[in-house]
């Protein structure tokens, strides 16, 4: 099972979600850790590589293992002043989700966000 550094970025009551190219569902930004890389460092690195956003503040908040998931999510709350922009060919799009609109998303998105509220 791989370790995934997962970012939660809030702004104006919305959370940042991304959709990989060729996928139908949205997820929280993040990605796998490199060899011996801390999960929060991976979350920060992926946010910058994929969306050009630099963390102003980061806090690792919890770890989540979900049944049926191929990843262990190590979740960090990230604060940034940067606006997202697509920089990585792996991503198709990003959205600021109000957590109310019915959008296609992976179940871990709801499970992680429920732990924060």
Residue locations for each model-derived region?
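Short, intrinsically disordered low-complexity segments
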Residues: 1-3, 10, 59-62, 71-73
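N-terminal strand-loop-strand
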Residues: 1-28
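Small/flexible residues
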Residues: 4-6, 21, 62-65, 76
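Unchanged
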Residues: 33-57, 64-115
